[in-house]
Amino acid sequence: MKKEELRLIFMGTADFAVPALRALVENGYQVKAVVTMPDKPMGRGHKVSPSMVKLYAQELGLPILQPDNLNEESFLDELRTYQPHLQIVVAFRMLPRSVWQMPPMGTINLHGSLLPMYRGAAPINHAIRHGDTETGVTTFRLRHEIDTGEVLLQEKLPIGHEETFGELYERMATLGASVLVHTVDLFLEGEPVSIPQEQLPGYVGARPAPKIFKDDCRIDWDKPAEEVHNFIRSISPAPTAWTKLHRPGMESIVLKIYRTQVIEREPRHRGRFGSIIWDKKNLDVMTRKGVIRILSLQMPGKKQMDAASFLNGFALSSDMYIE
């Protein structure tokens, strides 16, 4: 089959999916329609806004479907009118069987991990949080159980020791777009080979990567410095790690922490975890084992700033601590 004959439906919502859609179109594939979530309130002002995928699809002039319910017969009927050979899912939502079984070639998904590692909604975050030095992307055939389908292609990607979620997210989206195009290329040649996840070389079982909520983002300083550092960078810039600066006799302040550095893995300073060590330029916090240097943070109602700016405008005292 030729590229111009292969009819594709693309399903995605988050900005992670935009490079994948762009790559398919720029490589000559015929995306007949884009399925994305309905417009919804976003941000502090709760302004009703479209998804990033919808905005890009509008630029391309592609038909856009925004069903509230993926099982609605009206949506299924409209989807059938495009007679897709293959459906592609990137950063979307769980599909009912009636949708993913519709195309004769099936439905494939791009996932931000080396499956079966980190099945779930937040694979990139969890890879950083666990201190992994390597991750990757996977394309696989969609099945009913989430992220369990047979693997088509995988490609590895190193994780920098100081790399944040936001930085890795962008690199993963770019890599994923390339791997997805190569995967769709395989369908032009016939039925691609796919491998059950439990038969992959080095298989040691699955690891979950559940969605991360704001309530999960408080920093626990009663952990080794390396774990605290990984936790903070795994959710930077969003949903953002936070902690409380306690000021005796005054209300505590919530601080958002964006970037840190491990300066001591073995404790040389004595004191309780959460104790603060500072000078004119550096803001350090003791953990259960080792010391973390805060490089970038944010106070309520203020912009993100470096530690030196914070110290220049905020008077710390020896009886204050972080928890």
Swiss-Prot record:
Carries keyword Protein biosynthesis?
yes
Give the source species. Answer: Porphyromonas gingivalis (strain ATCC 33277 / DSM 20709 / CIP 103683 / JCM 12257 / NCTC 11834 / 2561)
Q: What is this protein called?
A: Methionyl-tRNA formyltransferase
Q: Which Pfam families match?
A: Formyl_trans_C (PF02911), Formyl_trans_N (PF00551)
Single GO cellular component term = cytosol
Which keywords annotate this record? Protein biosynthesis, Transferase
Q: Which NCBIfam families match?
A: fmt
User: Does the keyword Iron belong to this entry?
Assistant: no
Which gene is the coding source of this polypeptide chain?
A: fmt
Q: Name one GO molecular function term.
A: methionyl-tRNA formyltransferase activity
Q: Which domain of life is it from?
A: Bacteria
